[in-house]
Amino acid sequence: GINIGAFSAPLLVGYFGEVVDWHLGFSLAGFGMILGQIVYVFGQKHLVGIGDSHHASEESKALMSKPLSKIEKDRMIVLMLSFLIMIVFWGAYEQAGGFMNLYAKQTVDRVVFGFEIPASFLQSLHAFYVILLGAPMAAFWLWWKRKGLESSAIFKMGLGTIIMGLGFMALVGAAYEVSVLALEKASLYWLLLSYLLHVIGELSSSPIALSFITKLAPAKYASFMMGAYFAITGLGNKLAGEIG
């Protein structure tokens, strides 16, 4: 559902914003946010009892007061190192909404069958590729595990970051066409390839990171570390804004 929304929103808002009027585009985005809030408010009846606080059992209290073992401390260090990888990953990945979109608007030939694709439409590519490749990627990693070739979570996250980096390398082809071949605009397929590699990198990193945290984080810090992961994601987005 999230990716369906992420796919359709840039098409609708992008069309009305770029083609019709920017004020209408922003209004449509605001309407979508209000609609989401309405669904949340009226859906509360389906969430009765979920997330309500309960008194901690004696066992839970004992667990929370127990000091971390050496193994748990080592795991926390590994998690911190993985957070560094994710800062770099999200800082690069979220360039899609910044300089990559400006690059698409100014430098890429977006005319297909006589129709110029609004640059904002390309923001749908990430979600489209996730919908298209999510199941095959999950099946691949399961097959990889059955073959006895299971890789560590750190390896997968590092690999995902490298693959995502290759997505930027694909833009070298676009730069070559413009700067060396002196074409007026770069071919669109370079950007399509770049986004494809970014999503393959994301599917190798993001789901793995969430699973990695739940497995490695000590029970007393599980919720904190999950929250820290999303804070790190936000820091990566901040880095993306500073760069692009």
Residue ranges and their predicted role:
Residues 1, 23, 116, 188, ...:
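Loop-to-transmembrane helix entry/capping segments in MFS-fold secondary transporters
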Residues 1, 199, 203-218:
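Intracellular juxtamembrane helix-capping segments at the cytosolic ends
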Residues 1-18, 24-40, 123-135, 161, ...:
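Glycine-rich segments within core transmembrane alpha-helices of 12-TM secondary carriers
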Residues 13-118, 136-137, 141-147:
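Intracellular loop-helix junctions on the cytosolic face of multi-pass helical membrane proteins
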Residues 80-83, 120, 185-196:
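The feature captures the transmembrane alpha-helix scaffold of multi-pass secondary transporters
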Residues 91, 95, 200-207, 238:
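Hydrophobic transmembrane alpha-helices of Major Facilitator Superfamily
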Residues 143-164, 185:
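Cytoplasmic membrane-interface "Motif A"-like loop-to-helix N-cap segments
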Residues 170-193:
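Helix-loop junctions at membrane interfaces in 12-TM secondary transporters
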